Amino acid sequence: MKSKIALAFQKCEKENRPALITYFVGGDGGKKKSLNILNALSKEADLCEIGFSFSTPIADGGEIQNCHHRTLTSGIRIKDIFDIVKKYNKDKDSKPIILMGYYQTIFHYRENKFLKKCKEVGVSGLIVVDLPFPENLPFAKKCKTNSICFLQLISPTTSIQRAKKIIQSSDELNYLVSMLSTTGGKLKVLPKKILENYNKIKKINPIKKLVIGFGITGKTIRSFKNSDGVVLGSTICKEITRSLKLRQNPVTNLSRMVRDLKKKIL
């Protein structure tokens, strides 16, 4: 039986387009509004990443850091993220949910308990930013036991030899970091160069899916039409912050924005 992630990519392949993956910090704007944001994003997205808040999100740039700070100060915790995912997955047409965050949260929750809860609420995948290969292998194995895809991160400086080891041990989906920067950084590398690196990594195992993230915006997304998928994060978080500051409804604004961005990769 194919996983929810595999079925999502299968649908994209039939439509001859990359998967659109959206990211936002769970609980931003409050639990109710956050669920509404997730529902709105998932109408256009093929997979949905949800960040779980952390006080020192070292891989994230200013836009996403603002969201982490906002959710933490409003009292949102990991249990609230699980509640949001559980409610969202009651919809039979729900998209695969990938949780993204930092290992300390998982460590304090306890690995086995955390994965059990993920499985219970219907999480399809996990990205743990500060748990690199090969140290992440025992945890990745636990994820697989719980039918949860552990996404390995591959950076621009990862050698082909190391990339081969990572891909060989990985699950069905991996994440290529586009450049040496935090999330939301301005692309310092031409999309052409990013794609050259992407194609080298993709050739290692063409069957496994590889998506591109970090620095993807409305101006650059079209360049990655031939990849397996693109991740939009900081662009979305920036719009949430702008909407909340102007006391506008982020749900309405995000729906329009993501719909327009998706048209660029069709």
What are these regions (language model features)?
Residues 25, 30, 100-108, 132-133, ...:
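Glycine-rich beta-to-alpha transition loops that act as phosphate-gripper elements at the mouths
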Residues 31-42, 158-169, 204-205, 212-230:
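Catalytic cores of alpha/beta
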Residues 73-75, 122-135, 149-158, 163, ...:
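Catalytic beta/alpha-barrel core
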Residues 200-208, 219-222, 227, 231-266:
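Alpha/beta catalytic cores of nucleotide-metabolism and tRNA/nucleoside-modifying enzymes
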Residues 1-21, 84-90:
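N-terminal amphipathic alpha-helix/helix-capping segment at the start of soluble metabolic enzymes
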Residues 15-21, 92-102, 143-153, 201-215:
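Short beta-strand/loop segments at the ligand-binding rim of alpha/beta enzyme cores
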Residues 47-57, 125-135, 175-185, 226-246:
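Glycine-rich phosphate-binding active-site loops on the catalytic face of alpha/beta enzymes
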Residues 163-201, 239-244:
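Glycine/Thr-rich beta-alpha phosphate-binding loop at enzyme active sites
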